[in-house]
Design a protein with these regions (language model features):
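Active-site/ligand-binding neighborhood in enzyme catalytic cores
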Residues: 1-96
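C-terminal catalytic lobe of FAD-dependent flavoproteins
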Residues: 220-264
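Conserved active-site loop/cleft motifs that coordinate metal ions or position small ligands
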Residues: 22, 213-216, 258-261
Length: 264
């Protein structure tokens, strides 16, 4: 069934509690950074397609994941360089609102420095941000943007190894943490501890130190071992969001407004 949820699929096929709570839900929650309750409402078809595309359904010959030297900032630099070489002007300022084109009037971007008119405007931001910034879009576009919500997730960079499994040989790249009383209807966000040493080529000076990123930690790392705290926002792909994604092409280019981002 294309609209079947993960909860319905697990119930229909009589998967046991141990499989759900000790393997399946932790894995899915770690991937999508959401609560158990939200996971169970995900479309099973979307989940299976994602796992297939990322080589997660096979036991052997899984794809080798690679990282970019220097991190994501390196490809951002290259994009900026390519734009500048093509004589594209890059301004770094906050956009206050965007007026969609209507009645023969071009789309307008309003920022602190004034108003600028454009033939086309690309909203390369989160769906909720686009909905807040845009003025003059039709009801269909508003409904699609509103149907793809974002949620905040807290990440802490630290070196507190108490957040890794007690048995060192069990240390993995992704380490899921759950309270002993966690139940499938929990609204708590999933807690995952990423061991960066297994994910990124760290400098030699750091290779003997366990670098950890804890997402939505259930407890706090020792303050002296904390390096940085960051708030991230991630899209929530429930059934309504998946349906809205399918309808997104209907509004691309409408009123000279285009959309792109992790949610599209």
């Amino acid at each position: 069934e294309p609209d079947e949820t993960i909860a319905d699929f697990l119930d229909r096929n009589h998967f046991g509690r141990s499989f759900r709570e000790n393997y399946f839900l932790p894995m899915i929650g770690a991937i999508w950074s959401c609560s158990v309750e939200q996971m169970l409402e995900f479309p099973i078809q979307t989940m299976v397609r994602f796992c297939h595309n990322h080589g997660l359904l096979q036991i052997q010959n899984r794809p080798q994941w690679l990282t970019i030297q220097g991190g994501s900032r390196e490809y951002v630099k290259r994009i900026v360089r390519a734009l500048e070489e093509s004589h594209v002007t890059i301004k770094r300022e906050n956009v206050l609102c965007v007026n969609a084109a209507q009645n023969g009037v071009s789309a307008e971007v309003i920022s602190a420095s004034g108003v600028a008119s454009f033939d086309e405007v690309v909203m390369a931001c989160h769906s909720d941000q686009a909905l807040t910034l845009l003025h003059g879009i039709d009801q269909e576009a508003q409904n699609i943007l509103a149907a793809i919500p974002y949620q905040k997730n807290r990440a802490i960079l630290h070196t507190d190894t108490d957040f890794l499994p007690m048995t060192k040989r069990c240390w993995a790249a992704w380490n899921y943490t759950a309270q002993s009383d966690t139940v499938p209807t929990s609204k708590q966000h999933v807690s995952v501890n990423y061991l960066i040493n297994r994910l990124q080529p760290l400098p030699k000076a750091l290779q003997d130190t366990q670098i950890i990123v804890s997402l939505n930690p259930s407890s706090e790392p020792k303050p002296k071992l904390v390096q940085q705290e960051i708030q991230y926002s991630h899209p929530v792909f429930d059934m309504k969001a998946i349906q809205a994604q399918k309808a997104l092409p209907l509004i691309q280019g409408s009123s000279s407004i285009w959309y792109c981002g992790a949610w599209t």
